[in-house]
Amino acid sequence: MSNRRLAPTVLALLLALPLAARAQGPPRLVLMLAVDQLRADRVGPELPGGLGRLVREGRWYPDAVLDHAVTETCAGHATMLTGRHPGATGLTGNVFLDVEAGRRVYCLEDAPERAGVIGVPGEGRSPRNLRVTTLGDWMKQVRPATRVFAVAGKDRSAIALGGQHADAAYWFSEEHFVGWTTSRHYAAELPEWIHAFNGVNPPKDGFLAALPERWEHLPETAQGAEGPDDFPGEAGDLSRTSPHPLRDGDLETFAEQLFASPWIDVVTLDLARELVTREGLGRGDAPDLLGISLSGNDVVGHRYGPNSHEARDALLRIDAAFGGFLDFLEAELGKGSVVVALTADHGVLPLPEWLAANGGSECPAENGRSGLKRMGLGLLWNLYWKFSPLSWPESWLVFAGPTIGVKRALARDEGVDVADVVARTKRHLEARPAVAHVWTRDEIENGDGEFAALYRHSYDPERSGDLVVQLAPTCLISSYGSGTTHGTPYLYDRAVPLVFFGPGIAPARIPGHAATVDIAPTLAHRLGVPTPEGLDGRVLFE
């Protein structure tokens, strides 16, 4: 072969070297996708869109769980990119307890004068209550050019995914129909492109203008459904059957209807697409991080249950919308440029009526439902007549989800030992059929067995109060006579999907234990980013 004929071949090889080196380097974008209340048994390779593609082409952990007991949104989201259990993150639930002040604290609240929510007077939000750092913080420490953004329907989801030093976190506010917003912890004003996305005169412009008048179920929804569309126990104020109102009433009513449908999740992905374009994510000198949480799926599940036509329709729409978003990322940044982790913050209990009809109820309480108001009033009167019958009636307790704290100031004023109030409260609640156990601080800190470990992972001595209530399996305590919820240590609340997808990640189905706390160390390992000492999670694969 002559030198003249060899030269083009050598030149082609030399030109290919930077591309090969870039392909072996870190991805351009890390995407953390959380689907609120997505049970593990809802996701599989049969889904035709983006979620199904992740399972088919990614590394799938079908037995993944939350490794903590109090399975709520704030706690679950905070485990994903910190690698720490809720007891360490400080975000033990959607609200936590300040027993000294005798009040509940929203998990990511902050002073309005320091971190006021734009457009919502008197409300402040920031990661101030998060005790630890996240993957985005670690990435920025190694490569300061890294940018970190998060977007979600719920403020707590976006802020928890963004971490301590996010460039911005955006969420949807129903109040006064603010639309998509942020807090002044991140920026003094919203960027113009967010204003344009919200619209100057909604619903005539902005994202609302593109929404249909009604939420009508897809034809394929009924094909994969597990029962009739109208099922006992479903919430009926926005219709128990297709179609459901979506643009009926004033703007605040629009917002409520939107959040009770899969359209809020479709819009979240639309906003994320706009964010990627406007901020140029994945186009810098360092990998960027984008956290997305799809919050509407949770509201749909609460209202109609995970086996409903509504939940099935929401899943199909999310699957399709995320498929389009993933195609967009690959078209913009190139195939092999994005690493994705998929999980959920918790699962959910099926409707008690559905369990009763299908032979799945284990709850000793009648109908599987117990009234929160009746149970709570009985307890409070019990304590009042025992400890302060001559004083003005006042609750001795403050509640945050399943956690209970005794008000310290009241106990001091009445000369009552806190331990006596704790013991009486425990006896009263454990006599109720719907309650399996009421955990004391000592039992949590020193107990043996799986449940003790799970509650220990959820427990923060400064924020979890004095008692934690464990309901009996499949029991539901609620103020409502319809819908369902989550928050227990049982697998229907703890089993979540977990999938990793991207360059260098071979398709595989990996049985066995994995947890949401494993996501951050696994992604950090793939990025070559050092992690803090003392993480609760582990690297799942090389």
Question: What are these model-predicted stretches?
Answer:
Residues E72, N94-G124, G162-Q164, A168, ...:
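Secreted, luminal/periplasmic, and some membrane-associated catalytic domains
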Residues T146-A152, A158-I159, E220-E226, D265-V299, ...:
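Active-site regions of oxyanion-processing enzymes, predominantly non-cytosolic
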Residues K204-E274:
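Long, low-complexity, polar/charged, intrinsically disordered or flexibly structured peripheral segments
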Residues L258-G284, N297-V338, V422-R424, H428, ...:
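A long, amphipathic alpha-helix that forms part
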